[in-house]
Structures are given as C-alpha cells and as structure tokens.
C-alpha cells in the first residue's frame, strides 16, 4: 500500500483528534488513604500512564475551605521509575483543625502535573497515635494506690512525645482528677499514680486519656474499687462441650477445677446451679442446685435435660434454641476458711455444633473467573472450629478448615452478570444431616466500566503468615478480545493500619493470563493488610477504563519486636523471701515496664489486663478499610480498601462519609430391751421400704420434735409417712431418755520437747498484691541482636503464684506485651491466716488460721500460738500465752479458729506463730486487720449552694455561710470528716440545630441578566456557600459541589463588573443613573464573597468611596437618586416609611462589612461611618417600624452604640421577645429579625438569643422565590453567625475561696470551662462553720458533706436469719466415748426471715477449745427418711475436728428449725475459747447470722468492760492481790514503784453499783500517797470499774478502806471524769480501821502500811 493521500491523512488526523485518549494523552492519577491523620507521615502515590519523559509534580495539601497550604512536596515522575512515585506528607495540627466542632474535617490534596491539576478532597482524622494504659492491678480497695502507666505511641506504634490529658472518672462518669502532661523526653512512657480516698464510690472506675489536640479520640482503661480480701485459691468451670445440643439426652456436663494459688489441688465442697440466659435476662433453674464434692481439685456436675425442660416456660425445646446456659459455682474449703465464686456463661443452646460465616468473603465476583470463598466456621461459643470439612452446593468444592476456622473454597463462576447464590454446608461424618450447619450468601457481579469484559482477580494461598514469609499473589486477567496486549503492568498498593505501606508495579509480559507477585512479609504487615491492584487501558469504547481488585490478608498477631521474661530454670522450689533472678530479653534501647501481681487479683477480676491482642484489637478498630476485599466496581475496590483515587480524566472514588466503616445489621445403741421392742415393731412391716420408714421413726434424735413434725420431712409417699408415725408414736411411749482427740490449751508439759521458741520465729508480714513496678532499660545487644537484662529480686512473703507482666516500648520496634511469666512460691508447712476485709470495734468475731502440711508421708505435731495484742481482747493476754497443740496428717490442713474482740480503730496487727515438734520447722504470719467504728457510716449533707456570682452575688461577689454539721448522734471516740466539694457547671447554651445543608440546594443558581438581576442571582449562591462553610455542612451537601458553587460566584462577579460605571457605582444598566442602594448591596455581597473568591479590592473600595463622596449628606444621611427597577430585591426598605434611616443603616452596615478591606484605601471611611451613626442615634427613639428599629439597631451595634436608651427600645419592639414583626409581611419580618439577631450576637446577649433563633427556625424559611433576596441573604448570614458565636459561648471562669478557722490560710480553686465538670474537694477533720466567696463568670455547685459514724438506733447484726445457739450439760445417761472427760448438748435453732423457705443453706460451726462433735449423732441426722441435714463435713485431721460444716436442704420461714447433737470434751484446758455458729444462704452470701456459745457465758461472749462506748478487755486475771502471797513493806514499796504505776491512794468504798457486765465502785480518796496523772484531791470521789467475773474475788465491802494503786493505762475517760479500771495490774489491799489495828491479826499490817505511806510521801520512789 502506497503512501496515504492528503485527504486520507486529514481524515486520520481528524479521527485521532476526535479521540484524544487514543493519541496517548497521559492519564495522571493520585492515590491517597481516604482518611489522612494529623501529625502522621502519610503516603500519596502519583502515577502517569502512557506518558513520555520526566514529569515534575508538586503535591500540596490545602485547608478545604480557605485553601491555605498546609504542606507541600515535590517529586519527578521518570520513565525509569515507570512514572510511579510516592511522596510522604505530614499535615500539621493547627487551630484550623479544631476537633471540638461537630462534623468531619477535610483537606484538598492537589497534584500539579505540569499543566494538569488533579485534586481530591480527603477526610481528616485527629488520630495521630494511640494511648495504651496499664494499671498495676485490676482491682483495688478504698484507701489504696493505683499505679498506672500511659504508653504514648504514634500510628506506627512507636514512642511519641506529645501532650496528653488524663482523667480519672467515678463509676458515674464524674472526673475527680485531671492531669495535662507531656511525654517529651519520657521515651513514650508516663508513670503516674492516684491515691484512692477511704470514702469512695465502689464499682468500675475509668482512666481516660487523649492527646490534647484530639479530645474526641479517647483511650480508656478500667479498674474496680471494692472491699475485698484476696482468695487463696482459684476456680475454673469447664463444660465438656462449649455448647449444648437441644436434643442431647445426656445433658450438659461441667468439670469444676479448684487449685490453690500456689498450684496445689483444693479439697472442699462446691454448690452448683445452672440457668438459662436470654440477652440480659437470667433465669436460674432452682431444681438444678446441687452440692458437689471437690476432691483433689476436681468435681463434676450435670444439668440433665429433664431439669432444664422443667425449669423453663414454655417447656419446649424450640423456645430454648438461640438462648444460652450459664453455670454458677461456689467452692468452700473443708475448713470453711475461704470461699470462691466462679461463673461460666454463654454456653449456647444449639441445633448444630457449628456456625458458618462469610465475614471474610468478598461480596463481589468477576463473571467467568474463580471466586475465592473464605468460609469461617466457628463453634457456638464463637471460637474457631478447625478440621471441619465444608462443601459448596452445586459445584461440590470442598476444603478443611484450618486452626483459625477458615477454609478457602475456589468456585468457578458463570459468565453472567446475574447475582450468584452460594450455599455452603459442613460435612462432619459423626453428625446426622439435620445437625450439619448450612449458610447461604449472595455475591454480586463486579461492574465494569462501559459494560466491557475487562476484569482483574487477585488470589492468595491460604496459610498462616508471619514476618519472614513470602506470599504469592496471583493476578488473573480477563479482557475484551484484542485488548490484553495493552496491559503491560499492574500497579499494586499495600494498606496496613490505615497507612499506604507500599506501592509497586508488577510487569506483565504479552500473553500472560496469570502473573505471580512474590510479596515478602515484614513485621510492618502485622496484624493484617490489604493488597489493592489495578490496571488501566483504552477500552473498546475508546474511553479510558480502570479495572481493580483487592484482597485482605491476615498475619499472625505477635509483637513487631521481641520481649520475653524468663526465670532461673534451677529455681524450681521458691520460698517466700527468697532471692531469684529474672531475665528480660528484648530489643536494644527498649524500655520495659514491669509489675508482679498476685494471681489472686486475677481470680477476682481478670478483665482489665493489658495484652498484646488488646493492642491489636485497638489498632484493627482504626483500620480505614471496610471489607474483606473486592468491590462493586473499580471505585468501590479503592473505597472499600480505604483509598481515595482520582485521575485527570475525572475518574474518582466517592467521598468517604465517616471515619468508621458502616456496620452490617445485627444479629446412735439402745438397751437390749428397747432394741428388741423396736425390732418387734419393725417386724410388723413385711415390705422392705416400709420397714425402713418404721425403723427411722423409732430412731432417737436429739431434737424434741413431735412425730408429726418429723414426718413432714419425708418425701417417699403417704404409706411411708403412716408407717413412720405409727412406729414413732410406739417408741415414744416406751422410750427412756438415755470427743475429739485434740490437745489444746496451755499444755505446759510439752514445752520441754524439742521445739523452736516463739521469739525465734520471724513472721511473714509483707503481703503486697503487686510489686516490682519499675521501668528497666535494655542496653547493649548480644550477637543475635537481642538485649538481655538479668535482675536479682527478693520475693515477698506471700505463698502464691506471682505473674510477672512486662510491656516494652522501643524506638524501632514499638510496643510489645510479653506473655506473663509465673513464679510459684510455697513451702511444705505454712500458716494461711484468713482475715476479713474489716471488723467492727467492740464486736466479737472469729478468725481462722489454716495450717497446711504438704509433706508426703509425715504427720506433724504442731504448737500454734496466737500472740497477744492489747488492741484485741482474746484468749492471749499480756500474762498468759495462748497455745494449742494439734496434729496435721500428711498432705492435709487444719483450721484453728480464734475468737477476738477488736478494741481500737485502725489497722491492727494479728499474729499467729506455729512450730513443729522435733523438727526445725516453723512459720509465722503477721497481718493487719482493719478495725472500723461501730454504727453506720453516714454521709450527711450540710449544705448545697448554686454559685453564680453575676446573678446571685453583690457587685459580682457571692458570699456563702456554711454552718457546722450536727453530729449529736456520732459514735464517741471516732473522727468525722467534712468534705467541701466544688464542681463547675459548664453549661453550653446549646445551639439550635443548624438548618440542614441539603435544604439549600435550590440556592445554587447561575446568575444572569442586568446589574440588578445578576445580583439577585448571585446572592443565594454567595450566602449558601458562606452558610455551608460556617456550619461545616458540605459533607451533607456534597464535598465536590463547593467548587462548582465557587465557579458560579466567579461568574456572577465577572458579569457584575460589566455594570460598573466609571464612577465605580452600579446601576441596572450602564445608561441609568447609579443606585445608592444597589452600589451598597454590591459592596455588601462582594465583601462576603472576598472570603471565597478573588475580589479586586479597587473594585470594592471604589464603590465605597463613591457612596461616601457622592451620596452622603453633611448630616450623615445617605440619599438615593437612582432607585432600583427590581423593587422586590430591596426587602423591607421597599416600604417608604422611615426610608432615610433605613437606607443610611443599610449603607452603614455595608461600609462596616467592607472596612477590613478598604480602610487603608478610603481615608474618609471611619468619619463617614461615625456621621451616619450619629444621624441614626438622633433618629432612633422616634422610629415606629419594627423593621427600621431592627436594621438601625444592628448598625448601632456594629459601632458599639446600642446602649440605653436605644437598647431598651430595641428589645421592647420585639413581639414576645422573639421577633421584630409587621402584620402580613413574612419576608420583611424574617429580614428584620435576622438583623436583630446579628445585633444580639454582637451584644453577646446570649440569654435573649435562643427564642429569636427558635422563631427563625420555626418559619421553615430556606430562601429563594420572588422578592426573597434580602430575607435569604440576611437569615443565612444571621444563622451562620449564630452557629459560629454560640458554641463558643462557654463562660466559666470563677475563683472560689474559703478559709477554714482551723487553718492558717485560705483555700482557693479556679473553675474554668476546660475542666469545669472536674470534681474538686477539700477535706478537713474539723467540724466547723466557715464562709466561702465566689467571683467571676459562670455557674458552679458547692456541696458540703459531713462523713461520720452514727450510732445505730437498734443493733442489727443478722441479715435475713434468726439464730439461737445454746449448750447444756448432757445427763449422766448420755452415751459418750470412754476418753471423753465431759459431754454436752449443742442446740442450734434457726429460722429464715424471708417470704419463702431458704433452700440450700449452710451452718459453719466452730467448736469450743477441747471439744469435738459426736459423729454418730451427725450420721443419724443425715440419714433416714426424715433427714434433718443433707450432709456434714469436718476437718480431715482426726486430731483437730474444730470446724464442722452442716448443709441443710432448707430452713423454714414459718417455724424454727432446730438441730441438737452431743459434743464431747476430750481435754481440760485452762481457758475455753468460745465456739461460734454462722448460718448463711448459698444463694446470697450476704444473708448471714453469727452467734457464739460457751458453757460459762450465756452468749459465748468474751469479757470486756464498756464505758461511754469505750471497751477494754477483761478476760485477764482480776487484780494483783493474792491473799496467800507473803506481803511485807519491801514488797509493797517494790510493787508500787514499778514502771508504769501511776497513782497510790488510800480510799474508802462509799457506793457499789452492780450492773449486767461490770461493777462500779465509788471510792472517796482519803489520802493521795503518790499523785498520778489524775489531779485528784483528798475528799474527792472517783469510780473504779471491774468486770462481774471479778466480783467474788474482790469481795469489796461498803464503808471499808483500801490501799490501791494501778497503771496509767488503767485510767479511763477525760478529766475531770476520770474512771479507774480494776485489772490484772491493780493492787487492792484491805486497810484495817484503827480499832482493827488493835487486833494482833492486823497489827503488823497496820504498822507496815503506816511505814509504807511515810516512805512514799517523804522519800517517794527510788527510781
């Protein structure tokens, strides 16, 4: 073929010209994350397709509204780089980005490719990093200290130095502490602490933290505040299956695993109850309550299908499907010393054991290409189900699920653009077809551009990826015929953690349908990433096409760096206090925050631990990608992967609407004779079952119940009851009414055996719940690049398992949480002293020391001692030590109960020591017990005042007088605390909602026509853009529409210049005289538009100059000589009345609005404004029209002249104080009221503003329509100003000061808006009146609360139970073991005080010293058809059966239930410690009652002396004098001069008062032989108090005289009402009368008493 002719060439050129893309005109594109984060490095990808040569590119990021350049970068796209480049940008935080405002913020990313500009508006996020909060524990007691660290990291999880705001909030969400701290130079770790007050709200507290510039991006951690003691063991509940088949006949089996914290197994009893949970509603299955024995740490319980179905209504299986089961377990140790509760919930009731999910499957497929179905199979509890075969229906693709529960099925799709229905089912051989899980999904076809057949499909292999692996990504191509050669490469992008991590090209050779990319997986890819790929071509339609696909890939969650905590492998058996080593391995330079926590803490609360998976959860939530891959079209692919894409050809992604992805919709033996009679009677019953009923009726029981009452307990039917009553009545007519080998008390003989003395035993006393709160730096690395730090630590005194938790932060590898390292600490003999959280002063309580012997075969004989502490009344006294000797079998424990009465408030020490005979083994434990005052803690409100100095004060100062609290009912000798609480009320006067931006679409119009019509057309667009800018509503309106609107404003501006006359004035046409009003309006509109587009200032200011020079008269009035043709455009000015003032005000307003631009160009502008203002002032009081009052009022307000009297007229003109109204003039009224609103906003009269705005909003006026120009312009100008001004109306700046009389200086607080709701408090122990002053702006609240212990009106010690315990001697006829020294009957009677019987209740009984229960009596009570008790348990150790637990099926609420059984005394002891009985309900452990018993004390109470609510222990010997002692002068002198003796008196007994608990002796002081701290004179009286048990020993007689001395510690009460206690150290000696001294019997004594007195008075004591 020859050369083309000229005409052919022309045609060819024309054809090419008509299809510019075909000429290879390059396509330029920008790709950016569709959310850009402030202060973060972000990547923007720039590309040129089909380009030649080098292309310089400038990328700028501009503020969306003002187009200010925030950052700029330059690069060059070269051929060598394939015209692909990435630039890194960082948007600085600035005041432009104020996250306080509602709505989203945007920037415009602009790429200048030489002549071609591509720009895209992108959403901005204030998240410039993360804050992770670690507390040293998860649960705290009042008065303890919370230690916490805040890790400040950027979006790459690397340490960052920034300002952080930290709040601590109560469970009610009220902040009580606010800190603003910088993490600069802190290596990203802020260590903090907070002391929890003693008086504090219990519940879940929160630490909330945020970066100062991003107050809405809040990170939080919770901790619990509760009164608790750490448990000694943990309980786990493990169901055999994690779900329950609804038709499973075997029911649900659960295992209960109980282990001590130091790893040994628990023996005890578990109470188990099951229930059904439906949402938040829990239904307990009462009949499922069972008691399970825990042996060697394990017990099993079963919920039968029958019990389940009987317990719910309706009792059909279908109604239960979808609900879940829960099981609650309470485990009690055999010793009764500890109890732990555990619950397992969320055991789903299902028809199939599996669930199928398509959450990891894309929702779009490419026709005729493989579709990768990622099937996620879970167990009903949501955990991944591995090794389950899944198949698709129809295509029969099959695969096994992996460990993560995911199976990949690839199915071939038809070449059809119809939705594809895919059904997947499980195929588990062991399951019937009806129980297989099935799920159906619908996939939609990917939509190509121009209906082409160009597709791209990405597929990846299914494997668990980790850093260091390579991932093969398959690119499958399908195109229209003949087009595949055009595709020379694919562009791919990797998105991770919201960041564009990587951009690259994958080359495609001609003919390759499949191309494989090998992608190295680096730590940066954790925890998951998205790979997006696309190609572009000129399609069959001749137009540019983009084809894209994406795939989401999971990476194994782990630290990006390394952190491991190890111990010394040789340290297998660590004991308390021992030294051990810790090895910390991690990245060089990392700082590691450590803490050691007692595992018991996590038994109580394990919810709030910081773990690596929690860190990844937070990071994943910030992922801006929204689907598992693919998309509905090319733009959807980019959009769903979190990318914004735009090309020079206008191809682009939609605007992102929210920072977060949209969530899918939710989804006893008798006498032989009596025995024979019984056998005869029973023999009458031939039926074996009835004979048993008869025999049980003839059993003797200790309780005096009638036969009929006993029979009520029988459940075996009517015949059994008849036989039982018959035989019971028979034996009643015939019947005649017929201990623990425990060495206790002061067994002195044993002290001679080989045993460690008490004083040589060092007690364990340091039991922190957490420690090792340190930050360690890892220095030089080893060869493998890992740094190691070895720490030598000394373990604390606890016997437990310590969890060592470590969190590291490294400059290169970021944050890492190590797996916890456990250190187990124990010894084979130890004491566990179980103390309650707190006890009440003067109330008797029982504590238990549990002694453990973990030796394999050796029984230990142990002496255990409670040490004396004068703060308690107990069997241990200053004179007598309290020992017990017990035997503990191997691998066993024994509980030793101690009864104490706390006498002093505060933290008091309890110490128990134990030593093993003939071994060098001992242990001691010293713990503190919190003793609280009697009565009830009361929070009494003394005063509540509103602080508002401006409204409630005088001269801006408010004074408040606060009285002292009335504490007349306060418990004596207790403190009170007055809390002065201040809180600001940061009340934002809530702005009325802005007019919905979408309603303004009709205002965007194209201006046209004459000089007046053009302004009518330009007005609505200018004011709409201004309003949408000010209210930040472009998102609703359409981000891309703003540029279009600006183009229209530019057009209107250009067109208006055509009507500018040489004088710079304006008219409708150039041949008409210029118009004052129109020129002023042009000035007004152009002044506003100057913020939006480029306006020539000479044009604007020329018009201003013309108005002043040509149209203002000397009196300041502006005149109109060229009225406008379109009178409808001038609004309320159209009414000729008061025209001069209206026009002058209108022009004045325009001049003021142009002032910022023109003041430098028009010298006469300020003078002109002043003249016009003076004219308006002079005319204002005579104005009649509300319109003129409003517009002139705004003009005056602009000059700061709207003051009285003008202000009064302005406000009074308003109808109902909300509108400036003329009859039947809606548009004028909207315009006038808008002017008035602007005036009120300038005046900052924010109280008057809301009703006006409400009225304007109620008009539902959205502008537009004939005659609406002024109303439209003014209403949106005013409402925009309102939205700008009012949210900033946050007035709170108040100084509050008060001076407490007991303090030297005043206390001052400043309440500011920023921290207004922060609770400030000041505490004082003084109860006093004070005054407070407040000055400043805003409102606040003062609350004054007195916290103190008030006396209870009646003593309430029992909750929901009545309990009576008595002990009486058994008759001689009672059977007892040969070795028993004494036998008694213990009777326990109880009644439940609720509305129904108490089911499953427990009696916890402590035996008196030396006593043990009769096991045959207990067997009798627990067997037979009339069972009185379900079961009983005693300590395993036969030598120490000192605790007995009895389980009762029920306790009646209508009558007393009584149990009586014998107790035998096996050893006589010097001091019998009282026993105790506690009854409580399993269902509610708070419902309990405790009573004490003792053979010599009716109520089992230890002796104490109480006087004016102060108590002293009186369990010791009564007084010093022993009549058999040999007493002489020297003995008396020595004793009276011993250290501590305070006084020596000669007294006469004048009165005796014998009371219930103590005796009061009134003595007249005859002579003060040695004066003491009580300044008593001879002749005065004093009271001497003695416990009743000393009455017989003292035998004091009225009228007799006595020599008395005692210690200062026995003086009681305040002067002058001092009383004296007669105690163990008091000397009481009869002083014979003068007549008695004549008797030889008394002569020597009388002489010595005289000499004693003389020596003491004359010489005193030698020391």
Curated annotation (Swiss-Prot):
Ranges of residues in domain NTR: 1518-1661
GO BP of this protein: amyloid-beta clearance; B cell activation; complement activation; complement activation, alternative pathway; complement activation, classical pathway; complement receptor mediated signaling pathway; complement-dependent cytotoxicity; complement-mediated synapse pruning
Recorded GO CC terms: cell surface; extracellular region; extracellular space; protein-containing complex
Phenotype seen when the gene is deleted: Null mice displayed altered lipid metabolism and morphological changes in adipocyte distribution. There is reduced adipsin/CFD expression, increased number of smaller fat cells, decreased DGAT1 expression and activity, and less triglyceride storage capacity associated with delayed postprandial clearance. Mice on a high-fat diet exhibited no diet-induced up-regulation of adipsin/CFD expression nor adipocyte differentiation.
GO molecular function, one term: receptor ligand activity
Gene3D superfamilies to which the protein is assigned, alphabetical: 1.50.10.20, 2.20.130.20, 2.40.50.120, 2.60.120.1540, 2.60.40.1930, 2.60.40.1940, 6.20.50.160, Alpha-macroglobulin, receptor-binding domain (2.60.40.690)
Entry keyword set: Cleavage on pair of basic residues, Complement alternate pathway, Complement pathway, Disulfide bond, Fatty acid metabolism, Glycoprotein, Immunity, Inflammatory response, Innate immunity, Lipid metabolism, Phosphoprotein, Secreted, Signal, Thioester bond
Sites marked Coordinates Mg(2+) for interaction with Complement factor B Bb fragment (CFB): 1663
Cell compartments where the protein resides: Secreted
Glycan attachment positions: 939, 1617
Cross-link entry Isoglutamyl cysteine thioester (Cys-Gln), positions: 1010-1013
Signal sequence extent: 1-24
Subunit note: In absence of complement activation, the C3 precursor is first processed by the removal of 4 Arg residues, forming two chains, beta and alpha, linked by a disulfide bond.
Name used for this protein in its record: Complement C3
GN (gene name): C3
């Amino acid at each position: 073929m020859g050369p083309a002719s000229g005409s052919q060439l022309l045609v060819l050129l024309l054809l090419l010209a008509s299809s510019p893309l075909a000429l290879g005109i390059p396509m330029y594109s920008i790709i950016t994350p569709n959310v850009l984060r402030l202060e973060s490095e972000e990547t923007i990808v720039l590309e040129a397709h089909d380009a030649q040569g080098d292309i310089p590119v400038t990328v700028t990021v501009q503020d969306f509204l003002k187009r200010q350049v925030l950052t700029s970068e330059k690069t060059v796209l070269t051929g060598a780089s394939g015209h692909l480049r990435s630039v890194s940008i960082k948007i600085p935080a600035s005041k432009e980005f104020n996250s306080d405002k509602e709505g989203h913020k945007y920037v415009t990313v602009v790429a200048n490719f030489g002549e071609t500009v591509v720009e895209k508006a992108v959403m901005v996020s204030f998240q410039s990093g993360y804050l992770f909060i670690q507390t040293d524990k998860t649960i705290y007691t009042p008065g303890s200290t919370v230690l916490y660290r805040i890790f400040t990291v950027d979006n790459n999880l690397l340490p960052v130095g920034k300002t952080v705001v930290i709040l601590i909030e109560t469970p009610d969400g009220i902040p009580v502490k606010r800190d603003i701290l910088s993490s600069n130079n802190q290596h990203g770790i802020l260590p903090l602490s907070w002391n929890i007050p003693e008086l504090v709200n219990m519940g879940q507290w929160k630490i909330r933290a945020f970066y100062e510039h991003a107050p809405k991006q809040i990170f939080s951690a919770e901790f619990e505040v509760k009164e608790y003691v750490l448990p000694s063991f943990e309980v786990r509940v493990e169901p055999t299956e994690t779900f329950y088949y609804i038709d499973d006949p075997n029911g649900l089996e659960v295992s209960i695993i109980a282990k001590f914290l130091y790893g040994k197994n628990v023996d005890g009893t578990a109470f188990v109850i099951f229930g059904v949970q439906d949402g938040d509603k829990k239904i307990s299955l009462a009949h499922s309550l069972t008691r399970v024995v825990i042996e060697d740490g394990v017990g099993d319980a079963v919920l039968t299908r029958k019990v389940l179905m009987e317990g719910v209504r309706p009792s059909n299986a279908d109604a239960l499907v979808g609900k879940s089961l829960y099981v609650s377990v309470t485990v009690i140790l055999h010793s009764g010393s500890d109890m732990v509760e555990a619950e397992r919930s969320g055991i789903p009731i299902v028809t199939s054991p599996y669930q199928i999910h398509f959450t990891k499957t894309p929702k779009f497929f490419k026709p005729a290409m493989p579709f990768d179905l990622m099937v996620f199979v879970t167990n009903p509890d949501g955990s991944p189900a591995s090794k389950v075969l899944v198949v698709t229906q129809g295509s029969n693709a099959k695969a096994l699920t992996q460990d993560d529960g995911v199976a990949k099925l690839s199915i071939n799709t038809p070449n059809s653009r119809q939705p594809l229905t895919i059904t997947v089912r499980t195929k588990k051989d062991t399951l019937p077809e009806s129980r297989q899980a099935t799920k159906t999904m619908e996939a939609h076809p990917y939509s190509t551009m121009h209906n082409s057949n160009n597709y791209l499909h990405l597929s990846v292999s299914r494997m668990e990826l980790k850093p260091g692996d390579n991932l093969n990504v398959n690119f499958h191509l399908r195109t229209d015929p003949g087009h595949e050669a055009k595709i020379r490469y694919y562009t791919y992008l990797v998105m991770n953690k919201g960041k564009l991590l990587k951009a690259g090209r994958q080359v495609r050779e001609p003919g390759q349908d499949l191309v494989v990319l090998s992608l190295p997986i680096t730590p940066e890819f954790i925890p998951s990433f998205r790979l997006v790929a696309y190609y572009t071509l000129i399609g069959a339609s001749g137009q540019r096409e983009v084809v894209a696909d994406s795939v989401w890939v999971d990476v194994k969650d782990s630290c990006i760096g390394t952190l491991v905590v190890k111990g010394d492998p040789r340290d297998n058996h660590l004991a308390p206090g021992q030294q051990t080593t810790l090895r910390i391995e991690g990245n060089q330079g990392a700082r590691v925050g450590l803490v050691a926590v007692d595992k018991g803490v996590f038994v109580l609360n394990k919810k709030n631990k910081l773990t690596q998976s929690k860190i990844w959860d937070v990071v994943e939530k910030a992922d801006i990608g929204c689907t598992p891959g693919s998309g509905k079209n090319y733009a959807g692919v980019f959009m769903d992967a979190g990318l914004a894409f735009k090309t020079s050809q206008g191809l682009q992604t939609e605007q992102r609407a929210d920072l977060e992805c949209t969530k899918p919709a939710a989804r006893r033996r008798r006498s032989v004779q009596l025995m024979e009679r019984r056998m005869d009677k029973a023999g009458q019953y031939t039926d074996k079952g009835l004979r048993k009923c008869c025999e049980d009726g003839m059993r003797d029981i200790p309780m005096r119940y009638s036969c009929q009452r006993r029979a009520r307990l029988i459940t075996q039917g009517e015949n059994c009851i008849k036989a039982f009553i018959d035989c019971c009545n028979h034996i009643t007519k015939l019947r005649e009414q017929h201990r623990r080998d425990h060495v206790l008390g002061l067994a002195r003989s044993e002290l001679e055996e080989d045993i460690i003395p008490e004083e040589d035993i060092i007690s364990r006393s340091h039991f922190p719940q957490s420690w090792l709160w340190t930050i360690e730096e890892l220095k030089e690395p080893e060869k493998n690049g890992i740094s190691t730090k070895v720490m030598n630590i000394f373990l604390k005194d606890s016997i437990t398992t310590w969890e060592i938790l470590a969190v590291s932060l490294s400059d290169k590898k970021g944050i890492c949480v190590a797996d916890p390292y456990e250190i187990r600490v124990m010894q084979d003999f130890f004491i566990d002293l179980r103390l309650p959280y707190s006890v009440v002063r003067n109330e008797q309580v029982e504590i238990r020391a549990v002694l453990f012997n973990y030796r394999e075969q050796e029984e230990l004989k142990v002496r255990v001692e409670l040490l004396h502490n004068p703060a308690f009344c107990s069997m241990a006294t200053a004179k007598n030590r309290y020992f017990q000797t017990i035997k503990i079998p191997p691998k066993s424990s024994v509980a030793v109960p101690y009864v104490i009465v706390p006498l002093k408030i505060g933290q008091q020490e309890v110490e128990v020591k134990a030593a093993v005979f003939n071994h060098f083994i001992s242990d001691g434990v010293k713990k503190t017990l919190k003793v609280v005052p009697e009565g009830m803690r009361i929070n009494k409100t003394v005063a509540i005042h509103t602080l508002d100095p401006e409204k409630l004060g005088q001269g801006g100062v408010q004074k408040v007088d606060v009285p002292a609290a009335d504490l007349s009912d306060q418990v004596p000798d207790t403190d009170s605390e007055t809390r002065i609480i201040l809180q600001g009320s940061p009340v934002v006067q809530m702005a009325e909602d802005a007019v919905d931006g979408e309603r303004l679409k009709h205002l965007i119009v194209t201006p046209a026509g004459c000089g007046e019509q053009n302004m009518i057309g330009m007005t609505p667009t200018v004011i709409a853009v201004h309003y949408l800018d000010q209210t930040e509503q472009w998102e609703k309106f359409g981000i891309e529409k703003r540029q279009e609107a600006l183009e229209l404003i530019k057009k209107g501006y250009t067109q208006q210049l055509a009507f500018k006359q040489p004088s710079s004035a304006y008219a409708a046409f150039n041949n008409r005289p210029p118009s004052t009003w129109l020129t002023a309006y042009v000035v007004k509109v152009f002044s506003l538009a100057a913020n939006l587009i480029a306006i020539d200032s000479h044009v604007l200011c020329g018009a201003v100059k013309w108005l002043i020079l040509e149209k203002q008269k000397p009196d300041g009035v502006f005149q109109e000589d060229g009225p406008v043709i379109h009178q409808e455009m001038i609004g309320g000015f159209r009414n000729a009345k008061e025209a001069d003032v209206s026009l002058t005000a209108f022009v004045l307003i325009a001049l003021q609005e142009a002032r910022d631009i023109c003041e430098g160009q028009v010298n006469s502008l300020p003078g002109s404004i002043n003249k016009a203002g003076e004219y308006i002032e002079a005319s204002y009081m005579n104005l009649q029209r509300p319109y003129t009052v409003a517009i002139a009022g705004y003009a005056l307000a602009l000059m700061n002249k709207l003051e009285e009297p003008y202000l009064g007229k302005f406000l009074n003109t308003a109808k109902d104080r909300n509108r400036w109204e003329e009859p039947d003039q809606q548009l004028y009224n909207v315009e006038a009221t808008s002017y008035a609103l602007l005036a009120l906003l300038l005046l900052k009269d924010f109280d008057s503003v809301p009703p006006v705005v409400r009225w304007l909003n109620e008009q539902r006026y959205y502008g537009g329509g004939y005659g609406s120009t002024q109303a439209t312009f003014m209403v949106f100008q005013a409402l925009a100003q309102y939205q700008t001004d009012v949210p900033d109306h946050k007035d709170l700046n108040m100084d509050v000061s008060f001076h407490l009389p007991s303090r030297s200086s005043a206390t001052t607080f400043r309440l500011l808006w920023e921290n207004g709701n922060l609770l400030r408090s000041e505490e004082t122990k003084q109860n006093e009146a004070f005054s407070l002053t407040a000055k400043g702006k805003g409102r606040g609240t003062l609350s004054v609360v007195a916290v103190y212990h008030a006396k209870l009106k009646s003593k309430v010690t029992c909750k929901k139970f009545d309990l009576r315990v008595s002990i009486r001697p058994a008759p001689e006829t009672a059977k007892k073991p040969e070795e028993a020294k004494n036998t008694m009957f213990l009777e326990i009677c109880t009644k439940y005080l609720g509305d129904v019987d108490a089911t499953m209740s427990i009696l916890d009984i402590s035996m008196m010293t030396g006593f043990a229960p009769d096991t045959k009596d207990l067997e009798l009570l627990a067997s037979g058809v009339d069972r009185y008790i379900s079961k009983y348990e005693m300590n395993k150790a036969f030598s120490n059966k000192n605790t007995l637990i009895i389980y009762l099926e029920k306790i009646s609420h209508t009558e007393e239930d009584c149990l009586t059984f014998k107790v035998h005394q096996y050893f006589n002891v010097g001091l019998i410690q009282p026993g105790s009985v506690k009854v409580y309900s399993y269902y509610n452990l708070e419902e309990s009652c405790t009573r004490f018993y003792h053979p010599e004390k009716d109520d089992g109470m230890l002796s104490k002396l109480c006087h004016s609510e102060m108590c002293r222990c009186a369990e010791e010997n009564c007084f010093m004098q022993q009549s058999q002692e040999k007493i002489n002068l020297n003995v008396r002198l020595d004793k009276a001069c011993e250290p501590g003796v305070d006084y020596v008196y000669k007294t006469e007994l004048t009165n005796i008062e014998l009371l219930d608990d103590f005796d009061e002796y009134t003595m007249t002081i005859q002579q003060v032989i040695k004066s003491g701290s009580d300044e008593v004179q001879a002749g005065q009286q004093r009271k001497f108090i003695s416990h009743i048990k000393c009455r017989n020993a003292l035998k004091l007689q009225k009228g007799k005289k006595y020599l008395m001395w005692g210690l200062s510690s026995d003086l009681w009460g305040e002067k002058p009402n001092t009383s004296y206690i007669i105690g163990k150290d008091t000397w009481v000696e009869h002083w014979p009368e003068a007549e008695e001294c004549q008797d030889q019997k008394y002569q020597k004594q009388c002489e010595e008493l005289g000499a004693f007195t003389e020596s003491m008075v004359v010489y005193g004591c030698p020391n």
